[in-house]
């Protein structure tokens, strides 16, 4: 059954829904286009899937354009992504040519000239603005952790960024002094009515996970994340092994590949090999009912881990908290905004600290319950799609005028 916008009243409350309906009025009938590089496999695609749908539900003519490219193009953009997060990379002239020519080709059929506003998501699509006569405001929405970007790469990207009207990031630590245009903060969100986040019973969750091969003979801890070096799945396994020596448990790693991440397959293979060397570690990938499986796993886990070493936001943190499960997360990027240390989980800086917090939480059921209750209310107040939608409405009202 298709979701109606008023359905959000029962989970987010009347106040914010009424505020959205009030503030969207100047934007009704306006054409707004989002552009990114993938429809599946990452947080950006997941957010856009809900956000674009809801924008249309409340009267904005919102479209979603996808950049198409070769494997070579996505190899280059993965390097750019990693460089933005601080990796020591360098782009050759031929790589830059692939990057810029692919975007130029896409500009021929992306058809944005009649939009009232364009929102370009992440570095993959950044040069697109250079191929249009700018008749409307353009916003660059950067979803990744740019706390300490590779200096040479950042100098290259700034040439494109400064052509935009505004740059939107997910955390105040990502604001850059060397960017001339306006910068603002919009934190991401989860959609509480999707299959991934809707209410399901524990018995339903057990059936779903059972079909995926998960057994319940030992307490479950989990990490749900793309197979990516920045998510540190190998470090999670090591932390789990340390914890398991003191309190018996099992680890489930559930992930997928984003269509714009050619390195995911290699990290998946490394993770599977590392899991084989351990005990009671299950690795699940690209499942048919992935969203429901994530939902079930986050509900039935005693603890969810998000041990990222760089993180733009980390939607899986709020997803797990929404289900009343405490989270142990890396003390980086947007995770810091979601985990209130000691209240709904713990922020950790290394493998040993992660392991000790796993042990501590597994041994204290009452604390896990208290953290879960606090976490759900914290997400309701701060990280639901309704707040996110209102932030975008205010952004668009400001830039369109």
Predicted regions and their residues:
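Conserved acidic donor-binding segment of nucleotide-sugar-dependent glycosyltransferases
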Residues: 341-352, 360-365
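Conserved donor-binding/catalytic core segment of Leloir-type glycosyltransferases
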Residues: 33, 209-231, 237, 251-252
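Short hydrophobic beta-strand element within catalytic cores of glycosyltransferases
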Residues: 326-329
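Aromatic "clamp/platform" in nucleotide-sugar-dependent glycosyltransferases that forms part
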Residues: 309
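Short alpha-helical segment that forms part of, or immediately flanks, the ligand-binding pocket
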Residues: 295, 318-322, 336-337, 343
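Nucleotide-activated donor-binding/catalytic signature segment of Leloir-type glycosyltransferases, i.e.
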Residues: 255, 259, 264-296
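A conserved catalytic-core segment of Leloir-type glycosyltransferases
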Residues: 1-31, 49-114, 186-192
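A short, well-ordered alpha-helix in the C-terminal region of glycosyltransferases
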Residues: 360, 367-382, 388-394
């Amino acid at each position: 059954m298709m979701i109606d916008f008023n359905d959000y009243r029962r989970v987010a409350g009347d106040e914010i829904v009424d505020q959205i309906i009030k503030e969207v009025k100047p934007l009704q009938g306006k054409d707004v286009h989002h552009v990114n590089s993938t429809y599946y496999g990452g947080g950006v695609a997941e957010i856009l899937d809900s956000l674009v749908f809801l924008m249309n539900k409340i009267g904005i003519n919102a479209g979603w354009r996808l950049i198409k490219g070769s494997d070579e193009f996505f190899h280059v953009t993965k390097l750019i992504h990693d460089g933005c997060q601080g990796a020591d990379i360098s782009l050759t002239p031929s790589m830059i040519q692939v990057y810029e020519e692919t975007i130029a080709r896409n500009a021929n059929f992306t058809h944005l000239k009649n939009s009232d506003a364009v929102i370009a998501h992440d570095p993959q699509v950044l040069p697109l603005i250079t191929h249009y006569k700018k008749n409307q405001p353009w916003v660059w929405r950067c979803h990744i952790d740019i706390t300490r970007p590779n200096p040479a790469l950042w100098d290259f990207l700034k040439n494109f960024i400064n052509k935009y009207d505004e740059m939107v990031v997910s955390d105040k630590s990502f604001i850059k002094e060397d960017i001339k245009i306006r910068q603002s903060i919009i934190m991401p969100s989860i959609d509480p009515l999707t299959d991934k986040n809707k209410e399901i019973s524990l018995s339903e969750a057990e059936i779903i996970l059972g079909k995926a091969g998960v057994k319940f003979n030992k307490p479950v801890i989990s990490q749900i994340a793309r197979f990516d070096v920045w998510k540190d799945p190998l470090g999670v396994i090591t932390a789990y092994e340390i914890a398991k020596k003191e309190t018996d448990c099992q680890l489930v790693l559930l992930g997928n590949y984003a269509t714009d991440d050619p390195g995911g397959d290699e990290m998946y293979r490394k993770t599977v090999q590392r899991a084989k060397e351990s005990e009671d570690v299950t690795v699940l990938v690209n499942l048919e009912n992935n969203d429901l499986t994530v939902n079930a796993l986050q509900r039935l886990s005693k603890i969810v881990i998000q041990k990222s070493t760089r993180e733009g936001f980390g939607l899986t943190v709020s997803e797990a908290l929404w289900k009343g499960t405490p989270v142990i997360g890396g003390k980086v990027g947007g995770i810091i905004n979601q985990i209130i240390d000691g209240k709904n989980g713990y922020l950790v800086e290394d493998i040993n600290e992660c392991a000790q917090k796993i042990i501590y939480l597994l041994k204290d059921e009452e604390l896990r319950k208290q953290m879960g209750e606090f976490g759900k209310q914290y997400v309701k107040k701060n990280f639901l799609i309704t707040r996110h939608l209102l932030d975008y409405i205010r952004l668009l009202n400001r830039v369109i005028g």
